[in-house]
C-alpha cells in the first residue's frame, strides 16, 4: 500500500488554497503499510458458552437528519467527493454536523469517505471529531453500522488497524436484514486478505462466540455453512477453535457447526470439529 500522505497530494491541496491537511500522524495514529499477521499469532483465551449473550450497542448516538439537505450540507458532501478540504472546513465552521446520519445520503460524512476509500479524507474527518465507532441509521430499532465492520468487509487490514487504533471497538456491530446484529467475523471469506484480517481481529480479542440476533449464527456455524473446500474450512475452524470458539453452540434451528458441515457433505470437517482438542 502506498504511503498514506504523499507529497503530490499535499502540493495539490496547498495549491488549491492552503487548507489544513490531516497531519501525517494524528495522535500517534497514521496509515502505514499493514504487516501480514502471522498464522502463529495467538488470541486471548475466550470463555466458551452455550448461548452467549447478544450484545446490542448502545454507546453510539447519532443525530438523525430526515429532510432535504441545506445548501451547506450539500456543499459539504460534494466537497468530500471532490476532496476539497478548504470547503469541508468552511462548512464545518458554518455548523454542518460532522456526525449526523443524513437519510437523503443514507450515510454520515465519514461513511461517505469510507465508501470512497479516501484515506486523507477519513483522517481529516476523524481529526475534526467524527465518531470512529459508526452510526445509527434506524432510530426506532437502534440499527447500527460499524466502520470497523465495514473495513473488515473490504478485507482491508490497514484500515481495520487504523480505525481500531483510533478507538473503534473491535467488537463493534453492524445490522442487516439477514443476520440482524453481527460482528466483523461475519464479513470474511477465505482470501488471504480476509484471513489476515481474521488473525488481527482474533489477536485483538474479538468475540469468537458472538451469536447473531437473527438466527443465532456463530462464526463457527457461519463458516461451516459456507460453500468452500474442506481444507479452507478446517483452516478457519481451527483458527476460531484455537481462540476459544465453542462448537457445541446451537443456532435458532437447533443445529451445530458439525450439523452444517455434514449438510455440506464435508465429513472431514465434521470429524475435525468433534475430535478437536485445544493445545
Region locations from a protein language model:
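Hydrophobic helical h-region of N-terminal Sec-dependent signal peptides
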Residues: 6-14
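Leucine-rich solenoid repeat scaffolds
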Residues: 247-279
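Ankyrin-repeat boundary/"N-cap" motif
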Residues: 68-78, 101-111, 135-150, 173-188, ...
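N-terminal segments that cap or nucleate solenoid repeat domains
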Residues: 44-105
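C-terminal segment of classical bacterial N-terminal signal peptides
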Residues: 15-23
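Ankyrin repeat domain, specifically the short helix-to-loop turn at the C-terminus of the second helix
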Residues: 89-97, 123-131, 161-169, 199-207, ...
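Ankyrin repeat A-helix N-terminal signature
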Residues: 78-83, 111-118, 150-156, 183-194, ...
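Positively charged n-region of N-terminal signal peptides that target proteins for export
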Residues: 1-4
Amino acid at each position: 500500500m502506498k504511503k498514506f500522505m504523499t507529497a503530490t497530494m499535499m502540493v495539490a491541496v496547498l495549491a488549491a488554497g492552503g487548507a489544513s491537511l490531516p497531519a501525517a500522524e494524528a495522535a500517534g495514529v497514521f496509515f502505514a503499510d499493514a504487516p501480514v499477521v502471522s498464522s502463529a499469532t495467538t488470541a486471548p483465551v475466550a470463555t466458551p458458552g452455550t448461548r452467549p449473550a447478544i450484545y446490542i450497542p448502545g454507546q453510539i448516538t447519532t443525530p438523525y437528519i430526515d429532510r432535504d439537505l441545506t445548501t451547506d450540507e450539500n456543499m459539504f458532501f460534494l466537497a468530500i467527493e471532490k476532496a476539497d478540504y478548504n470547503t469541508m472546513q468552511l462548512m464545518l465552521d458554518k455548523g454542518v454536523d460532522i456526525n449526523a446520519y443524513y437519510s437523503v445520503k443514507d450515510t454520515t460524512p465519514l461513511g461517505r469517505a469510507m465508501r470512497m476509500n479516501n484515506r486523507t479524507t477519513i483522517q481529516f474527518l476523524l481529526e475534526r471529531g467524527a465518531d470512529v465507532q459508526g452510526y445509527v441509521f434506524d432510530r426506532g430499532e437502534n440499527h447500527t453500522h460499524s466502520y470497523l465492520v465495514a473495513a473488515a468487509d473490504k478485507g482491508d487490514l490497514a484500515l481495520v488497524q487504523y480505525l481500531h487504533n483510533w478507538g473503534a471497538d473491535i467488537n463493534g456491530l453492524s445490522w442487516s436484514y439477514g443476520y440482524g446484529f453481527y460482528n466483523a467475523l461475519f464479513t470474511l471469506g477465505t482470501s488471504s486478505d480476509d484471513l489476515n484480517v481474521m488473525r488481527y481481529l482474533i489477536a485483538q480479542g474479538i468475540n469468537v462466540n458472538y451469536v447473531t440476533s437473527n438466527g443465532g449464527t456463530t462464526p463457527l456455524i457461519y463458516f461451516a455453512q459456507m460453500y468452500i473446500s474442506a481444507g479452507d474450512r478446517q483452516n478457519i475452524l481451527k483458527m476460531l477453535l484455537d481462540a476459544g470458539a465453542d462448537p457445541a453452540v446451537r443456532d435458532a434451528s437447533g443445529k451445530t457447526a458439525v450439523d452444517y458441515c455434514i449438510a455440506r457433505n464435508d465429513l472431514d470437517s465434521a470429524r475435525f470439529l468433534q475430535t478437536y482438542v485445544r493445545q
